[in-house]
Amino acid sequence: MSTPIIPWMGGKRRLADRLIPLFPPHECYVEVFAGGAALYFMRPQAAPVEVLNDINGDLVTLYRVVQNHLEEFVRQFKWALSSRQVFEWQKMTRPETLTDIQRAARFFYLQHHAFAGKVTGQTFGTATTGPAINLLRIEENLSAAWQRLSGTYVENLPWSDCAERYDRAHTFHYMDPPYWQTAGYGVDFPFENYERMADFMRLCKGKVMVSINDHPDIRRVFEGFHFEMVDIRYSTANARQGKTEATGELIIMNWEPAALGGLF
């Protein structure tokens, strides 16, 4: 088991101990909306075949660079500082002018310094309860992730293309789509996507788990599937503004956990 390499808005690090025990037996594990891939990194044992997919090209580049060019990636941070000014400079840098390794380093830096792990509308995050990321120990911190990513397929596909490509009877799709009516993910996600997701869950060969914010519209679309609720507190605005709030996380499955049993 390792840890996620970047903060991510809506990441499931704090829910891992409640979600992973629900995983069904499987041979192929697919994170269709990988994001920070918390469950992938934190599951106690790897699946024989594993896939990380995301539509965010910067994120996919980061995973591929850590997977294949870790030493050169780490070298990008030799003289780096955790600074509001550097953060603003990195935001102004056009990614298309950079090499893949430089682009991955820029994305890594921004995600580690952005408030709440947002991808868009980023502001420099400050904390008084813990130290800033130690940029001199990146190689030490990423070595476990490098080993974990070895042999994993990293895809940059629309979610439905990835799900259909890897769907087999022995596949488990974990889907953590953007929350309905929530901004900050860096991608538009119309409601029709949730409807297509529910249709896929009804027709696919494999098992599917969806984690999403609890909303009447979501419950209506996924009616007929097994629901479980967990509580979680997310902060997506400055705590001084009083915007830290508890919310319900809806876990949707196209199988009955009690009948099938768990993997771990």
Question: Positions of the model-derived regions?
Answer:
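Conserved active-site tyrosine of GNAT-family acetyltransferases
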Residues: 63, 179, 222
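Non-catalytic surface loops within mature trypsin-like serine protease
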Residues: 57, 112, 254-256
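SAM-dependent nucleic-acid methyltransferase catalytic core
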Residues: 1-15, 22, 37, 67-174, ...
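Conserved S-adenosyl-L-methionine
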Residues: 25-85
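Class I S-adenosyl-L-methionine
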Residues: 1-49, 160-172, 182-264
